[in-house]
Amino acid sequence: MDKIEIEEELICSLAVKGEKSIHKLLLNILAIVKQLKTIQSDPVLTYQVSTKAQQQLQSQQLQQPQSIPSSTNNSTNTNTNNSTTTTTTSSTSSTTTPTTTTSTTSPLNSKDSTATTTTKEQPSSPTLPTLNLNFVNDNDKIKELNQNCIQSILALQKTIKEISLLETKISQKPKDNIDNDDTIMKDDNNNSSTSAPTTTTINIEKQDQTSLSNELERLKMDAYQKNCVIKKLIDNMRLLQLSINSMNRTSTGTD
């Protein structure tokens, strides 16, 4: 009976250790999720945003030399229009209205073109450096979370090893029980008066053995669930590492 109680205490202590390790794993997973939420946006999407920003800068650089002759053309048009207005006012008064309208519209168009060019160039410059700085800090934080997860996984491995040792001990028990039964039968043949208490002790030992086997099955299920959680965590960390590598490549390209 003392051995059975000791084994039950060991199983209870292993169950407590397993629950603590699962709790640590869940806390680490929550920390990773919170860290991912603090990132500005999805790394895959930021890769697309950075390429679009580069395309906008290139298109603006191509449009900038074209905007200069447009202003010169507008100035030449205004000069020609002014010359035409002086000639037409001397001849007739009816033709002055279209020339004045064309002369007034040309500087407005030049102002609109300069305003559009200035508004396009403003949002492109501050977006690029903020992304690169944030992802460096995120990478360091995720490394720390990885180390915490590895420590919790090692603790789970220790509990699984202890469970396997208990299983081997319990599998060896039936052989010992058979030997004990043989000795008890011999004693029963010698002393028929003591047969009732020996049978009761055998039944108690069998019940204890069934309870221990049930506890082992429960611990196996807990270990299987932990293994599934660890596999999901490893897959998520691999995807996260791939996204960080892609962002590091884009950051070095933009720099």
Curated annotation (Swiss-Prot):
Q: What does this protein do?
A: Component of the Mediator complex, a coactivator involved in the regulated transcription of nearly all RNA polymerase II-dependent genes. Mediator functions as a bridge to convey information from gene-specific regulatory proteins to the basal RNA polymerase II transcription machinery. Mediator is recruited to promoters by direct interactions with regulatory proteins and serves as a scaffold for the assembly of a functional preinitiation complex with RNA polymerase II and the general transcription factors.
Any idea what this protein is called? Putative mediator of RNA polymerase II transcription subunit 30
| Gene name in the database record | med30
For the region Disordered, give the residue spans: 58-133, 177-207
Q: Does the record bear Nucleus in its keywords?
A: yes
Q: Does the keyword Secreted apply?
A: no
Task: Specify the species.
Answer: Dictyostelium discoideum (Social amoeba)
Could you tell me where the Low complexity compositional bias lies?
58-107, 190-201
Q: Kindly list the cysteine pairs connected by disulfide bridges.
A: none
Composition bias type Polar residues, residue spans: 108-133
- Which residues lie in Basic and acidic residues bias regions? 177-189
Reading the lineage from the top rank, the first entry is Eukaryota
> In terms of one coarse class, where is the protein primarily found?
nucleus
> Which controlled-vocabulary keywords does the entry list?
Activator, Coiled coil, Nucleus, Transcription, Transcription regulation
Subunit field text: Component of the Mediator complex.
The UniProt entry's sequence similarity note says:
Belongs to the Mediator complex subunit 30 family. Highly divergent.
GO-annotated cellular components: nucleus
Location in the cell: Nucleus
